[in-house]
Amino acid sequence: QHGTARWATDKEIREAFLHIPFTPNLWREGKNLPQNQGLVVGSIPRKKYATALVDSGDVHCLMIGASGVGKTAYYLYPNIEYACASGVSMLVTDTKGDVVRNYGTIAKEKYGYDVVLIDLRNPTRSSGFNMLSLISKYADLYKGNPNDLRSKAKMEKYAKICAKTIIQAGGSGDYGQNSYFYDSAEGLLAATIMLVAEFCSPEKRHIVSVYKLIQELLAPSRTKGKNQFQILMEKLPPEHKARWMAGAALNTGEQAMLSVLSTAMSRLNAFIDTELEQLLCFDSAVDAERFTSQKTALFIVMPEEDPTAYFLVSLIIQQLYRELMTVADEHGGKLPGRCVFYCDELGTIPKIEGIEMMFSAARSRGLMIVAIVQGLIQLERNYGKEGAQIIRDNCQLTIFGG
């Protein structure tokens, strides 16, 4: 006995997708640019040029191919070329640095893209990625116009997104009996992020300042019955949202408060690295709002030989995704411009927390995800059988290379 699943015939494949002449030489001169955005899923050889088979729908794709079959050269590169020609903003994970070397200059000079390189192999030569960028932007707008409640609301929302991303970066989000401490740490972290964005000078608005402030708040207090954090919060107006966000941590005993502060510190410890500070402490070269409104190519180069920085890849993807969903919600549930995440070697990098939800929720909002793996077993190892199945079920396209 067997089910009804089968391989598609050549005729069915040709009828299911758009046929677009794949002419990168003309595209790079600004000629015959494709009008339909989408993913390249195959090609038909012609005498003078190939015809690309393009799925123009909002779809996710799972590309499976063993090491050495040409996943990057024969699948990723044509898709990046087509994305550039059709004006889609993209995020690309790059384990060897080959992708940005081969396509960074082309995207910038031939297609007019804003190219951003997050280089975790050589952080001192990387573009900046300040996690507090959007929070600081709206803090300044609100400070300039206290009646601008929209900017105030955005500042608070992005602060909560940043805090949630950092807290969940180290675990699944299911903390059992310790959930109180992690939830409280998330609120405390959001409050501290808001304080840094609102009151620090521009050059000090970054995640390392958040770490230093929490570290100082751990110091013993001279006021009996109050810790340093409570004293700091009392200096704020009663209606300040930082006091509200930190409410669970403020109204607790001294020992519990220290545990909450320590939990937040443990999540921030990973950021204390002299090299990583070079990209975390300076202005961001890109944020979610620019990413979806301007043609942008964000390349993340990951050091294969040093997995200690891989957590930052997960963090960048999570934060950009959450911020993009916020932008989509403000535009009627759809991003102003289509975007795609090309997650090359998704099975090699550590688990990206909440990726199952990303695959479930992103598609209808105009964000496509392309997961490139060496085998399904890699997904099961990182996300478990259930998580791997969710990812597979949410990929409308599955392509095997070999």
Protein language model features and the residues they cover:
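Long, basic/Gly/Ser/Thr-rich N-terminal segments
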Residues: Q1-A16
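N-terminal pre-Walker A segment at the start of P-loop NTPase domains
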Residues: L18-A52
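P-loop NTPase motor domains
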Residues: V40-K48, A52-L367, N382-Y383
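Conserved ATP-driven motor cores of ASCE-family P-loop NTPases powering translocation/secretion/packaging/pilus
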Residues: F359-G402
